[in-house]
Amino acid sequence: MHFPAPHKLSRLSLLVTLSLVLAPALASTARSEATAFTQSLAATAASDAAIAEWYRTTNYETLWTGPEDAERRAALLAAIATAKDHGLPVPRYDARALTVALQTAETEGDRGRVEVEMTRAYLAWAQDLTAGALEPQKIDAGIVREINRIEPKVLLTRIANGDPKAVLDWLLPTSAQYMQLMKAKLGLEAQIAAGGWGATVPASALAPGDTGPAVIALRDRLVRMGYLSPSAVASYDRALQAAVTAFQLNHGLIADGAAGEGTVAEINIGPEERLKSVIVALERERWMHFDRSVKHIWVNLPDFRARIMEDGKTVFETRVVIGKNVPDQRSPEFSDEMEHMVINPSWGVPRSIIVKEYLPLLQRNPNAVSHIQVIDGRGRVVPRGSVNFAAYSARSFPFGMRQPPSDGNALGKVKFMFPNVHNIYLHDTPSKSLFDKEVRAYSHGCIRVADPFALAHELLSWQTDNAEAEFEAALDTGKETTVKLKEHLPVHLVYFTAYPDAKGRMTYRRDVYGRDAVLWGALSEAGVELAGVQG
């Protein structure tokens, strides 16, 4: 039998002895480090119930900071590094700061804190990208959107169990409009970095045939905007007139080729302001949680137009008048479903109009607004002579009011109903001249339609072969007639001051209600910045 040499035996004994002595110490150190990591993670996550619950249920397994998490960690850092491209607030998920934190984490306690910070960044990124960085109705009560945020547990389960890059790609908005807005954002940032669109036009208005420095400035600015080829011509010629017309069409202006006061004002708006509009539009796109491939009515309030859209294409279009830019009369942003139309409608006067407009008139003259009926709670007409209007206040007035079907009815000859808590609908109007105006904000909130009969024919054509004849027959009776739509039609009242047209070119509209300015302020406060713009 062979025995180890004495010196080898002593060395082996020493190693065995050392292992026996050090094993408890090494195990104790490992347990201590694990405890430090867990304690740090738990303490850091304590302020966020969803994150704390996730780590408790997974026995504090790492998502980002373990040696096996490299792919997931790299995918997240790469994704959140694009926050600026989306017009999102970089500080919420600062990839650079997280990278530094990872590189400088010296202790298990540091690693526990970084683990939670990366989870917070991931959840914030996922929520903001899929449902927006803002809660719109908290910022403006006129923006009524159902913001459907994905539950943190769902997001964490996906990233823990799925391919990291695929999960992060799944979060990205996919609409063509969003992609085009991102492209426009990059283009505007490049334009700003290159010096913008040059000097503003030093004139209040210009017309074909004019000459001089202001015309040169107008030409140069339109060249930089891409509406005109470079030229040394100093006069307002046909080429410049065509460029002005194209600009007007892209900005919702009366397209007459003359650079009037409104046109010059729009031309003088800088790329920085347009960039703000695009960033706000990106945020609004993130709120759009509905299928735009199905047939629907799209009313873009600042565009003063309603369209029937199907598979991304316009199949019907009409001008509209929207609510006045005063409190309680601005048209809200929301979505619902059109269920029916009413031909020869009566008009149930809204309570706000009754007490603010009609009651004061009737208190001065009981025969005022003679086209309006006073009605009781059962809908019965009340003789005016039996009512002492002066005895009532706005709060105590017990009657309603109604305008029967007539040529002068405030709702015209047809209204299109998508019942909602805002009491907003589309309707005809006897006030046709307002549709010729550039800015069409004159109603009490409802949407007046320039071509209501054509809209009715279009809607009915989906359920009958004789749409026009059937509509006219009901109209000729003079009686109030309800026609149900066999298939309800989604209606979306939206507010985009920047959006791509059918050819993909960016178009801009006035911020008629000032909502974009308010949203930009909120985004800026959250940490969104204009790239390349010095503050």
Regions found by a protein language model. Name each.
Residues 29-147:
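Cationic-aromatic interfacial patches
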Residues 7, 25-29:
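Short stretches within intrinsically disordered, low-complexity N-terminal or propeptide regions
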Residues 2-15:
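Bacterial N-terminal signal peptides that target proteins for export
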Residues 2, 31-54, 116, 123, ...:
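Well-ordered beta-sheet/strand-loop patches within structured domains
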Residues 13-24:
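Bacterial N-terminal signal peptides
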